[in-house]
């Protein structure tokens, strides 16, 4: 996805990270252009196992979809909850820092299915008490997509109009995928706390 690619680009340029393993369903020619990247091809991400994650210091999850792309609530849940929860299970009891992209409205009690699933996932992963966990809650993400997500595209246009009047960061202001990726890299390198949640404002203000 867009966030994942932006993250790979920044990790490639960060000397503290010597190697990057990217889990993909099929090999990407674009990823082959990065010197640090090794692609781990797994058609079903639920088959990711201990051997695959051992030896890593950080696990970044930018995995997510939309109800429209998934086609059903069940398919959406399988991607956004089950795969991310599986990754969290794998890194538990290992010296691995998990960094997870969630959503601004994540709330297990939300009447909105998307936000509810995001909240349930956050609650589950927090309950694992991982050695180190970062959760990022961005608002709408700005970036070019190969697929058209009309609501998000409309949101980007509306927020860009609002920004002309309100230049200071505010809670719902959209962020670029590059800024989110930058915040994740900064968190990976500097976070001291065992658990920290980065809200949309924190993401905007990270330098």
Model-derived features: positions:
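N-terminal Rossmann-like NAD(P)+-binding domain of SDR-like oxidoreductases, especially those catalyzing
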Residues: 9-10, 14, 65, 69-70, ...
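NAD(P)H-binding glycine-rich loop region in Rossmannoid oxidoreductase-like domains
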Residues: 36-86, 90-93
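N-terminal Rossmann/SDR dinucleotide-binding element
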Residues: 1-58, 180
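Glycine/Thr-rich phosphate-binding loops of Rossmann-like dinucleotide-binding domains
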Residues: 30, 69, 108-109
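Conserved Rossmann-fold NAD(P)-dependent oxidoreductase catalytic core, especially the SDR/UDP-sugar
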Residues: 73, 78-120, 127, 133-136
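Oxidoreductase cofactor-interface core, primarily capturing Rossmann-like NAD(P)-dependent enzymes
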Residues: 13, 108-207
């Amino acid at each position: 996805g867009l966030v994942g690619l932006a993250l790979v680009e920044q990790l490639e340029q960060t000397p503290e990270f010597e190697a990057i393993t990217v889990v993909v369903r099929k090999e990407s020619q674009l990823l082959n252009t990065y010197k640090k990247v090794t692609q781990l091809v797994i058609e079903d991400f639920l088959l990711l196992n201990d051997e695959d994650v051992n030896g890593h210091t950080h696990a970044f999850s930018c995995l997510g979809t939309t109800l429209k792309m998934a086609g059903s609530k069940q398919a959406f849940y399988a991607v956004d909850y089950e795969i991310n929860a599986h990754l969290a299970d794998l890194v538990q009891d290992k010296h691995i820092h998990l960094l997870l992209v969630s959503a601004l409205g994540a709330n297990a009690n939300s009447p909105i299915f998307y936000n509810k699933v995001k909240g349930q996932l956050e609650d589950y992963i927090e309950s694992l008490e991982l050695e180190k966990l970062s959760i990022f809650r961005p608002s709408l993400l700005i970036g070019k997509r190969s697929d058209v997500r009309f609501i998000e595209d409309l949101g980007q246009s509306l927020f860009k109009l609002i920004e002309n009047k309100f230049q200071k960061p505010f809670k719902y202001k959209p962020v670029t995928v590059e800024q989110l990726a930058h915040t994740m890299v900064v968190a990976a390198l500097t976070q001291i706390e065992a658990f920290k949640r980065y809200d949309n404002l924190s993401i905007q203000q990270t330098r």
